[in-house]
Every structure is written in C-alpha cells, then in structure tokens.
Amino acid sequence: APGRCQCLATCTNDALKGEAFCKEHMKFCPRSAPLSGSEPRYEPGRWNNDDTVRLTHNCFSYSYNIIDPRQIEACKKDPKCDLPFHQPGSKSGYPRFNNTDPKTCPNMIARLMGDNPKRILPSSFELKCPRGTSKIALVVDEDQDYHFLRQDKPKPGSKTGFFSQKSGAMPVTNLDAKGHKIFDVALADHNFDNSKRKDPLNYDHFCGYFCIPRHDPIFIKTGGSRGELRREAKFKQTRRK
C-alpha cells in the first residue's frame, strides 16, 4: 500500500508513487520546512560508491555530513570492515548501547545534546534554523534502534528541501520505507518491518527536529561492542560548493 500524503497531518489521501504528496497537494502545499541556506547537498554517490565509506558511517554521521578518514583507514586494515559506528552520547560519556535498554526519545535527545552543549537547538518543521545550521530529525524504535535523517539543499529549480537518510551500513537514500520522498519526517513512513531487510525495524516514535552546526567544529565519537575501539574526533564542517 502507498504511504500517506505528507503535506498536512489532516490529509488522509495516499501519496502518489515515489512522491511525498497526494494528487491534490502536488500542485500546492501550504506548509514547508524553511531553509537556512546551510543545508548539505544530496550526494548519494559520495557515501554509496566506496564501501570503506558506506560500511563505516551510519545515520548519525550522515546526518552531520561527516566522513571520518580514521574510519576509512581502519576499514582498510580490517578484512571484514567490522567497526563501531559514531554514536550519540559517546563523546559526553554515556554508556554504550545494549540490547535491553530502550532507545527512548528523552534518552536519545539527552545524548544528542550532551555531545555538543549549546550547539544543537530543538526546532520544529515550520521553524527556520539559524544561519550556519540546518535541520535533522530523530525517530526511534524503542525496543531496537534510533535513526536520524537530515534536510538537504533543494534541487535546482525547486524551493523544497526534502530529507534523506542512511540506515547503518546501507546506502544513502532520499526515500522512506514505502519508497516516497520525505517532506515531513513526522508524517513519512519508517516501518521497515515488511521489507527485505535482515533487521526489521519500525521507527514509530518521532522525537523531533533539531538545528545542528554546519560550518563550526562539532564533536562526535565512535562507540560499539568491538573491544574498546572508541575514537574522539573534532570535525570542521565545510560547505561543499
């Protein structure tokens, strides 16, 4: 079945194939997520074409538009490229994730804000992020996982900044679980339970939108179950022309 129209929460129409909107709202949607001008470009090839990048970066690093050269070098030295991902909360000293602790919105937001105090601002769909920052979104499957998405720069000729995502080591995509463009993360489909994925997930809790720095130094850190391989990194975000 197709996903719902993402224009308005009150619209119950199905979205057109591959689109975020129903037939009625393809012509005009009265709502939009305003752009700050600092949104990253949607460049799936930059993340998907090289396995040392794709296998070592997850939704968190993708939402920050960070490619960590140390992850790539470590992957080249490991035949299986089995490395821990960057995780929210690792920088600020939160314990590693385990299979029993729920990934709730309050817990994940505390981890996100704790890594970069005063740099990350809670936001909303129709609120414009300050210049030099742009919007990401957080959803969770409380039993299993968290997931971040980011708003991208519009395509030439368009004024709409759609969202894109990268699930774990999977390729980057600008479509939701039902193959529709992502206009409003809160109204898009994140139920991967019926897909061919090996790890069925249903991110059924929307935690909110956040504005994150795009040109200032920002901290993230890896953390996982593979020994104590945890590396802190300070990244200078740069605008890609």
Give residue spans per PLM region.
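Active-site or metal-binding loop neighborhoods of secreted/extracellular toxin and effector enzymes
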Residues: 156-241
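Intrinsically disordered, low-complexity regulatory regions of eukaryotic proteins
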Residues: 1-33, 38
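...with weaker cross-activation on analogous glycine-rich loops/strands in unrelated enzymes
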Residues: 96-170
